[in-house]
């Protein structure tokens, strides 16, 4: 089945005991799990980028009625199926890209979107598509680089204002042209401000931040005029929302001339 990235405990046998991040992803899960009910009875879960199945298995372990794990890598899917079957968990694993999420019917009570965002060449598109599958809790995690601080920013700036772009806490992402950590699929890595700003832009409300790379969110304003933001964008109908007293061409209508 090849080398494992998830260090699973399969009946006392660990699949990646020498992982460079330690007992990964259990080290993250121990901080995140406190935000998830002990019982998920009757709930559905979508695990996007499921890898070896760690999070799918943990959600099923809590009694989720239906868990679907998707990934684009057959090696990881085979590992996940093996782990779930060996541990006696009925979990559906399927080959599917984040860009194909619309092919999966319905929505899910929990969407796990962890360890995927920074691997996407089109990360905001991937996030918007993932949000469409969330009927309830949305769990987001991304590698972060740059400042871990956040700041307060105006809702608009004039064309001539540019000093904020030099502030390390301003929302920003780093583009990786070739490789990072020997991985050519590490495309975009946000700072903390950018991660939180993009979650809000996708219509999510941040509920908690249990781990430095992870946020627990709920859908709040994912629709405009009854349609998802990404669908409006594809249709060429995503006009900016004009705030009261705001001139979208660069100034305030209430400003003294």
PLM region spans:
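A structural helix-start
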Residues: 74, 120-121
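Conserved SAM-binding site of S-adenosyl-L-methionine-dependent methyltransferases, i.e.
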Residues: 117
């Amino acid at each position: 089945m090849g080398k494992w990235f998830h260090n699973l405990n399969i009946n006392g046998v660990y699949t990646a005991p020498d992982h460079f991040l330690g007992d990964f992803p259990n080290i993250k899960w121990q901080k995140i799990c406190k935000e998830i009910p002990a019982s998920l009875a009757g709930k559905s879960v979508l695990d996007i980028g499921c890898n070896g199945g760690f999070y799918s298995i943990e959600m099923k372990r809590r009694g989720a009625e239906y868990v679907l794990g998707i990934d684009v890598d057959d090696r990881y899917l085979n590992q996940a199926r093996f782990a779930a079957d060996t541990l006696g968990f009925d979990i559906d694993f399927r080959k599917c890209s984040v860009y194909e999420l619309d092919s999966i019917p319905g929505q899910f009570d929990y969407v796990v979107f962890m360890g995927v965002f920074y691997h996407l060449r089109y990360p905001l598109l991937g996030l918007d598509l993932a949000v469409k599958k969330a009927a309830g809790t949305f769990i987001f995690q991304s590698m972060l680089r740059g400042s871990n601080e956040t700041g307060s920013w105006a809702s608009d700036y004039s064309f001539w204002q540019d000093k904020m772009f030099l502030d390390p806490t301003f929302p920003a992402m780093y583009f990786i042209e070739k490789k990072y950590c020997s991985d050519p699929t590490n495309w975009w890595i946000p700072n903390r401000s950018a991660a939180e700003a993009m979650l809000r832009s996708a219509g999510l409300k941040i509920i908690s931040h249990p781990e430095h790379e992870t946020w627990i969110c709920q859908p709040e304003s994912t629709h405009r005029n009854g349609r998802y933001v990404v669908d409006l964008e594809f249709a060429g109908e995503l006009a900016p929302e004009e705030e009261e007293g705001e001139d979208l061409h660069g100034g305030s209508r209430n400003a003294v001339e």
